[in-house]
């Protein structure tokens, strides 16, 4: 979260993560830690704040109309995708900490560096709201790297427009649910 991304630098990404946590605390979903560092959010637009708040505490209202309104408000689909990745990851981590009775983890310092603003040329409009990197040969080398030659459903490719966010999400998926190679293996049993 503290590393420069494709569309935000480390400081911007941390501010978005802190803002998501603040909204969770404000909504009573999370307990305020003693060492809580409130987001400054100096360079966060009202559109981004609205997106972060909705993602953090009311994700059920996100539908295609919501997405299109955010895009029509000036956010690019790449920015939208990266913010989805950052907020979903910190929300996941915070709610997991709450569930096991652990304190919320402290945020690291932002890493220095600029965002790349490189859109993967393999990303195309498929059947999702945002462009994704396809399965199989159409995904080319980046698809092979992300999916390891396995077919991936849209739910796992949703962040692939920003490959590092997709990778980070897949790490959580593997830890909390099932190894990615097992997602479509309906004979797999966690207990074997």
For the regions a protein language model found, what residue spans apply to each?
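Hydrophobic alpha-helical segments
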Residues: 1-192
């Amino acid at each position: 979260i503290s590393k420069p991304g494709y569309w935000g630098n480390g400081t911007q990404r941390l501010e978005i993560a802190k803002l998501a946590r603040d909204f969770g605390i404000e909504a009573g979903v999370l307990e305020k830690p003693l060492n809580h560092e409130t987001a400054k959010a100096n360079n966060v637009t009202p559109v981004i704040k609205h997106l972060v708040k909705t993602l953090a505490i009311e994700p059920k209202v996100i539908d295609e109309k919501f997405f299109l309104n955010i895009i029509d408000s000036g956010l690019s689909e790449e920015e939208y995708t990266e913010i989805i990745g950052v907020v979903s990851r910190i929300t996941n981590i915070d709610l997991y900490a709450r569930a096991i009775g652990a304190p919320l983890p402290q945020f690291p310092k932002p890493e220095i560096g600029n965002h790349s603003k490189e859109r993967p040329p393999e990303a195309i409009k498929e059947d999702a709201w945002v462009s994704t990197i396809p399965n199989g040969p159409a995904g080319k080398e980046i698809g092979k790297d992300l999916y390891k030659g396995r077919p991936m459903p849209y739910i796992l490719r949703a962040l692939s427009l920003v490959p590092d966010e997709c990778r980070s999400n897949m790490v959580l998926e593997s830890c909390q649910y099932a190894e990615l190679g097992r997602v479509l293996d309906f004979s797999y049993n966690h207990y074997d």
